[in-house]
Each structure stands twice: as C-alpha cells, then as structure tokens.
A protein has these predicted regions:
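Glycine-rich beta-strand-turn "strand-cap" elements at beta-sheet edges
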Residues: 2, 40-48, 74-99
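An amphipathic, aromatic/His-enriched active-site/gating alpha helix that lines ligand/cofactor pockets
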Residues: 20, 24-36, 55-89
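N-terminal first-folded block
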Residues: 2-36, 40
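Short acidic, gly/pro-rich beta-turn/loop elements at beta-sheet edges
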Residues: 16-18, 50, 62, 98
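Short, well-ordered beta-strand segments in beta-rich or mixed alpha/beta enzyme
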Residues: 2-9, 39-66
Length: 99
C-alpha cells in the first residue's frame, strides 16, 4: 500500500475556495481504481492549513491518479491559492495489524 501525506497553507482570503476545491478533489479521487482512502482535514493548530491523507493499493494506482487531468488541474489551482509551497510525501506501507 502507498500512503500519501500532504499539506498546503491557504491565504486568509482564499481559504474557503481552497477547502471547496480540496473537498471536490477528495470526493472525485475516492472513485478512482486503487484508491483505498482519500481525505482532507483542517489543521487544529493552523486553521489555514489543509492536510491530506491518502491510501492507494499500489504505486501504479497512485501514478494513474497523478495522470488524471483533473488531478493535475487541482494541483495548479490549489497552488495559486496557497500562501507558500505545498508539501507531499509518499510512503510504502504495510498494515501490521488492526487494533
């Protein structure tokens, strides 16, 4: 399984638009093949920061997600609303156990 974490901090005047775009992206992405989960959250310590958490079946599914035109457009649109550069990290993960 591939785990993706990411974040972006919006400007005060663009936060509502950034949140709306992010929710649209998350809902669309959940329907893609290989998407196990895809979520966006507001950071409790910085209410202008959106935090993404995604789980993908494998790297191929994630690369297909990145290739979707709507995903590429989302990244461009979100970056235009950001106060600073976004971050994204990929992890190769194995579930050890569900508690």
């Amino acid at each position: 399984m591939i785990v993706v974490t990411g974040s972006v901090t919006a400007r005060q005047d663009t936060f509502d638009q950034a949140r709306k775009l992010s929710l649209e992206h998350v809902h669309r992405s959940r329907g893609e093949p290989g998407c196990i989960s895809h979520a966006v959250h507001v950071d409790c310590e910085n209410p202008l920061r959106l935090v993404f958490f995604e789980q993908w079946a494998d790297r191929a599914a994630l690369l297909n997600h990145f290739a979707v035109p709507a995903s590429r457009e989302f990244v461009k649109s979100l970056q235009s609303l950001a106060a600073a550069a976004s971050s994204i990290e990929l992890y190769d993960a194995t579930r050890l156990e569900k508690l």
